[in-house]
């Protein structure tokens, strides 16, 4: 499963979930790309998109997307650190088309 984290998500997710294949939007050269175009890029190369952008579901049509989206409640490192076990568990069970909000 190929995973990408949005530029608003702390890189601690990648650093702490080292057994997973995770890239960042910045590593892909997509920093600053608007969500609509970004989702097209992500769909072409990844299975899961992790973001903390709560407006994503209201600004974009997520129906029939061929990726899973995991929405985090915050972009604050202490919050994300506490959620790492839950994030890892959700990644174990996530399927294409899922939209999961932690």
Label the model's feature ranges.
Residues 1-45:
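N-terminal first-folded block
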Residues 29, 56, 76:
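Residue-level detector of flexible, active-site-proximal loop/helix-junction positions
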Residues 14-15, 59-61, 81:
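Short glycine-/acidic-enriched loop or helix-start segments at secondary-structure transitions
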Residues 22, 60-74:
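A short alpha/beta connector and helix-capping loop motif
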Residues 2, 48, 68-69:
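Structural motif
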Residues 42, 46-60:
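Acidic, metal-binding active-site segment of PIN/NYN-like and related structure-specific nucleases
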Residues 68-102:
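C-terminal structural segments of small proteins and small subunits
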């Amino acid at each position: 499963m190929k995973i990408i984290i949005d530029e608003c998500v702390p890189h601690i997710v990648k650093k702490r979930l080292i057994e997973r294949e995770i890239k960042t939007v910045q590593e892909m050269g997509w920093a600053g790309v608007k969500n609509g175009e970004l989702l097209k890029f992500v769909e072409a190369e990844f299975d899961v998109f992790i973001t903390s952008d709560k407006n994503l579901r209201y600004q974009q049509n997520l129906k029939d997307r061929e990726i899973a989206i995991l929405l985090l409640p915050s972009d604050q490192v202490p919050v994300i650190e506490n959620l790492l076990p839950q994030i890892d568990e959700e990644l174990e069970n996530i399927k294409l088309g899922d939209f999961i909000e932690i």
